[in-house]
């Protein structure tokens, strides 16, 4: 993850911990102007994260077709990675679509719907982390096979995906959970 992404997520986290009201002054009741209807319809995974996942999928697909031990090892990675990505796309990444509005001090009651996803992520964290271990084991086999066959693309992919998983564990998942906690704290305004 780039330093800019890390800094942006860290800034959001700090703002959420002390309260966005302190970071971004607001007037009135603390509620913001309604967002455009399109923005209220769903929680979208940030484009940069979607692009990274798409790139990982494309690279893995190429590796599965590379033949030899590397191709077979890549198929093993795909077998454990694909269902994991489905779950991430269902409930771990979409909450991050609220990073920008929340970091600007904007909160709307409809955002409370994200709690279904963040609660699901919280409950599934042990499984998600266990899947990361399975993915890491498959990546080791891929890296070993690619090294033996002198297929640098396999080695690079294994290293990139391992770093990606570490970023998810250290930044992505905790940020999604933090968004859930923040939205939960703000949702009390909606019940009044």
PLM segments and residue spans:
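Small-residue-biased structural context
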Residues: 2-8, 17-192
């Amino acid at each position: 993850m780039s330093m800019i992404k890390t800094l942006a997520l860290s800034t959001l986290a700090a703002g959420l911990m002390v309260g966005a009201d302190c970071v971004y002054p607001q007037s009135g009741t603390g509620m913001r102007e309604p967002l455009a209807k399109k923005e209220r319809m769903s929680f979208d995974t940030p484009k940069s994260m979607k692009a990274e996942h798409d790139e990982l999928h494309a690279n893995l697909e190429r590796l599965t077709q590379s033949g030899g031990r590397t191709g077979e090892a890549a198929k093993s990675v795909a077998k454990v990675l694909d269902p994991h990505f489905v779950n991430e796309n269902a409930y771990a990444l979409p909450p991050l679509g609220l990073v920008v509005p929340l970091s600007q001090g904007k909160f709307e009651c409809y955002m409370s719907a994200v709690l279904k996803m963040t609660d699901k992520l919280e409950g599934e964290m042990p499984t998600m982390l266990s899947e990361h271990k399975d993915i890491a084991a498959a990546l080791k086999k891929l890296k070993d096979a690619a090294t033996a066959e002198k297929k640098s693309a396999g080695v690079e992919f294994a290293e990139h995906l391992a770093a990606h998983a570490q970023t998810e564990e250290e930044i992505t998942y905790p940020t999604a959970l933090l968004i859930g906690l923040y939205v939960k704290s703000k949702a009390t305004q909606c019940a009044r």
